[in-house]
Regions:
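Boundary at the C-terminal end of the N-terminal hydrophobic targeting segment
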Residues: 27, 31-33
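Short cysteine clusters
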Residues: 74-77
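Sec-exported extracytoplasmic/periplasmic mature domains
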Residues: 70, 109-113, 156-163
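N-terminal secretory signal peptides that target proteins for export/translocation
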Residues: 1-10
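C-terminal capping alpha-helices of c-type cytochrome domains
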Residues: 136-169
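Bacterial N-terminal signal peptides
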Residues: 15-24
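Gly/Gly-Pro-rich "capping" loops immediately C-terminal to redox-active cysteine motifs
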Residues: 56, 66, 79, 83-117, ...
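Electrostatic cytochrome c docking/interface patches
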Residues: 38-70
Length: 170
């Protein structure tokens, strides 16, 4: 048996094929892992204005996003259906800080304390566009939501419940 293995028989081809497949799988897994970050890592590594949702057709991923929204505890302030409560309704036509992907991602990851005009983020250009009677600042969820992909799915659900952002309206 050792003779066949060392001599290049069918065993060496099988081992070579297995090593090739293992290498390909390992490389792919490493590549996929490199693409996924925590929300805080994504914010830190991406210049302002550059964050863009990988789910432009948000209706297809909305159900999964809603499950993640509930699991992260967003419903405690915004309500289970996004209609508000002690925080702003996600169904409003005007969102307090704006509705672009980059702003929504940073707002959820960093909280409103980092977006207020009086601090460094406010000096970077974040201004309130709407006003709501809210109980207090939104806490940051960048360390609660595990991956940037999970946060993008939550944003997809938020957009899906907002009349102004749905293609078919309300």
């Amino acid at each position: 048996m050792v003779h066949r293995f060392l001599g290049g028989g069918p065993y060496i081809r099988t081992v070579a094929l297995m090593l090739l497949l293992l290498s390909a799988l390992t490389g792919r897994d490493a590549l996929m892992a490199a693409e996924i970050m925590t929300p805080l890592e994504r914010v830190a590594s991406t210049p302002k204005g550059q964050l863009k949702s990988p789910y432009p057709d948000f209706a297809n991923i909305a159900d999964e996003g809603h499950r993640k929204y509930m699991a992260a505890g967003c419903n405690g302030c915004h309500g289970g259906g996004g209609g508000g409560g002690m925080a702003a309704p996600l169904t409003n036509p005007i969102w307090i800080y704006g509705d672009d992907d980059d702003t929504l991602f940073r707002l959820i990851a960093l909280g409103t304390g980092k977006l207020s005009p009086g601090d460094a983020f406010g000096k970077l250009g974040y201004r309130r566009r709407g006003s709501e009677a809210v109980v207090g600042p939104m806490p940051h969820f960048g360390d609660v939501i595990k991956t940037d992909d999970d946060l993008w799915k939550i944003i997809a659900w938020i957009k899906s419940v907002n009349c102004a952002r749905r293609a078919e309206g309300c």
